[in-house]
Amino acid sequence: MKALFLIFHGFEDFNGISKKIRSQIKALKECGLDVKTCYLEESNKKFRMIDDTIIADYGNGIFAKIKKRISFQSVINYVQKEKISFIYIRYDHNSNPFTIHLVKELKRLNCKIVLEIPTYPYDKEYQFLPFAYKRILWTDQLFRRKFVSYVDYIVTFSDDKEIWAIPTINISNGIDFESIKLKTKINDTNKELHLLGVATIHPWHGFDRILCGLAEYYKKNPNYKVIFHIVGFGVPEVVDYYKRLIKEGNISDYVHFYGGLFGEKLDEIFEKCDMGIGSLARHRSNIDKIKTLKNREYAARGIPFIYSETDDDFENMPYIKKEKADDSPINIDELIKFYKSVTLCPEEIRNTILNKLSWKNQMSIVIQKAMKYNLK
């Protein structure tokens, strides 16, 4: 079966979303599909690509920036020429008359269309973002029901059975275990504990709760050191806010920012750290149930972690600590106590999700429901 994985942006090596998409594509191929990837390549010029082939050259400058958002005839032509029967679209909150025309034409070609909404609901995420981002949401809200009317199924990581009157396929975020290195070093934590937060930093990650907790912890002049390592870029306003908290809390010696890391550099940080920090403020965007990528990466790496949402894949695991879904500072003493109570080694932690949460397992659920396609 010929399939197209369609995204409306490009790839970045350090970006967790890029890694996820590549893992999903790999999984679809492992399930037996002939998959091509449609994406944007942006350097000096703007190109729409199918794998390594340019299907549209938008040039450069302001007109190129406009064309890449409104011109999709090259995609329609490709799907028709190659007789693509299954299209998997990663939603980018970009419903508008042009993307509506795209999915309408794809449906006219008798394609089965599946739309992944990475986070749902997402409207309240925008309340923390600058005005330019809010304009994206307003346009999306105006057109999204018309957009999804041409979609057969919506893939969601929530428990919703329908979204905007379209039936859903409920899956978990998965892991490509071959690409995630298991932690091999058990650090000496008798005198210090290293925490790790990996994210494209937004308010709902709630790392400020750790920072405020550290500020309170160090007011007591403890002998035991706790250091927080933050990996990833983020919304500038949020990062600036974190840096103010660090300065005001006098904890600059105990918090380290690294920016985006991938490959061996990221592996090195995981070896150095002992516990993962998941999302601690999903309540800010009105989300309770979610199955985040980061929780799964922490488990695949083999480290215990904390979070505050409801994640059904981990709720009863002995290596996770649930925090309250509020804005209170994280109690660092309790965090240390929890870490010392975990008895599982990295391999044992990883083994708890090894079969269920592979991307091949999750994407096979999508194919079987969307295409009524029995995999061997």
Q: Model regions: which residues?
A:
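N-terminal subdomain of nucleotide-sugar transferases
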Residues: 1-44, 82
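Nucleotide-sugar-dependent
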Residues: 15, 94, 205, 264-269, ...
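Membrane-proximal helix-turn-helix segments that form the acceptor-binding/catalytic region
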Residues: 26, 73, 97, 101-108, ...
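Short N-terminal targeting/anchoring amphipathic segment
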Residues: 76-98, 111-114
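Donor nucleotide-sugar binding/catalytic pocket of nucleotide-sugar-dependent glycosyltransferases
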Residues: 137, 141-183
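Conserved donor-binding/catalytic core segment of Leloir-type glycosyltransferases
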Residues: 187-214, 229
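Nucleotide-activated donor-binding/catalytic signature segment of Leloir-type glycosyltransferases, i.e.
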Residues: 232, 240-268
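A charged, aromatic-enriched C-terminal amphipathic alpha-helix characteristic of glycosyltransferases
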Residues: 326-330, 334-375
